[in-house]
Design a protein with these regions (language model features):
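Substrate-recognition/specificity elements adjacent to catalytic centers across diverse enzyme folds
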Residues: 1-225
């Protein structure tokens, strides 16, 4: 491929196991090629998950995803990006810029060569969007995990004065007797406190399931997990 953005020639060698190995003479070229290869291998997946993280699914999949988009946008970082980048390593922004430039380089090639474009884009009737370095750090919902579900569950047990059930269901190592801090009322947590959290981190649902049914399924799954 001939692409703009590299300081010199770089290589991607795919071994017999399908593992790509990147060779470049410049530190930032490595990240450029890594982004290019990620897009070459899974452009539709990363485009979909970027849209999921930024709350842009309804733009391509319809109004049934508005609720999930709304939830996702509650977790998108909206602070000052200059200060945010300063909180990372000295060259973190340049690394992210190189990586996303590599993604964009493949997107441009794929748009000019339809055979390289994943078939899912044609099936769903849209094209991949370009990336910015800020996208990499603004998206937070992809990193959300399950601890908050456990915390809410414990609070509800505490509200019912049944904290002993927590130890029977989920053993702690070393053993620990949880006590409700003085002045803390665990009963004030609203029933719907997890709704936006679960929607924001939910996988993309292509079944056209109504938002309330999707949320009910997510709540049931979270309860069983």
């Amino acid at each position: 491929y001939q692409v703009d953005g590299l300081s010199a020639t770089a290589e991607i060698l795919v071994d017999e196991y399908g593992v790509p190995h990147i060779y470049a003479n410049d530190h930032y070229d490595v990240f450029f090629v890594q982004g290019f290869n990620a897009a070459r291998d899974r452009l539709w997946q990363i485009d979909l998950w970027k849209r999921r993280g930024l709350g842009q699914l309804s733009e391509i999949l319809g109004e049934q995803h508005v609720a999930q988009d709304t939830a996702a946008r509650m977790f998108v970082y909206r602070g000052d990006m200059y200060a945010e980048w300063l909180a990372y390593g000295n060259d973190a922004k340049r690394i992210a810029e190189s990586f996303t430039a590599g993604i964009n380089a493949f997107v441009k090639i794929a748009k000019a060569n339809p055979d390289l474009m994943p078939v899912e884009f044609a099936m769903l009737g849209y094209e991949p969007s370009l990336w910015s370095a800020d996208d990499v750090v603004r998206i937070r919902s992809n990193g959300l995990w399950r601890n908050v579900v456990t915390e809410v569950w414990r609070a509800r047990l505490a509200c019912q004065d049944q904290m002993e059930l927590a130890a029977q269901w989920l053993a702690l190592e070393p053993q620990w007797q949880t006590e409700t801090p003085a002045g803390l009322d665990p009963c004030v947590i609203p029933e719907n406190v997890l709704d936006n959290y679960l929607l924001a981190k939910a996988p993309v649902d292509f079944s056209a399931q109504p938002p309330q049914e999707q949320l009910a399924s997510l709540l049931e799954q979270a309860t069983h997990d």
